[in-house]
UniProtKB/Swiss-Prot annotation:
Name this protein carries in UniProt: Aspartyl/glutamyl-tRNA(Asn/Gln) amidotransferase subunit C
EC id: 6.3.5.-
UniProtKB keywords: ATP-binding, Ligase, Nucleotide-binding, Protein biosynthesis
Designated gene of the protein: gatC
Sequence similarity: Belongs to the GatC family.
């Protein structure tokens, strides 16, 4: 499927792109080249090929998800000027 000038003008309008008359032929050719590449990619027989999430078969060694620190909330809030229900109270700065 090849795009024509009217197609590119409509696409540019819908995408809110300001294309000059001089830019339309170059843009038309670029979009047609992209569509041609997509057609060639779709023509490749990929039956029986599993999709890859990543081209390398590398995996990350992850550490176990364990709690390594204790809760210091009470100690931190003990030195705060104002705390209520576990929340820090601050002066109102926006009316």
């Amino acid at each position: 499927m090849a795009l024509e000038r009217s197609d590119v003008e409509k696409i540019a309008h819908l995408a809110r792109l300001g294309l000059d008359d001089a830019e339309i032929p170059r843009t038309t050719q670029t979009l047609n080249d992209i569509l041609g590449l997509i057609d060639r990619m779709q023509a490749v027989d990929t039956h029986g090929i599993e999709p890859l999430a990543h081209p390398l078969e590398a995996t990350q060694r992850l550490r176990p998800d364990e709690v390594t620190e204790t809760d210091h909330r009470d100690a931190y809030q003990a030195i705060a000027p104002a705390v209520e229900n576990g929340l820090y109270l601050v002066p109102k700065v926006i009316e």
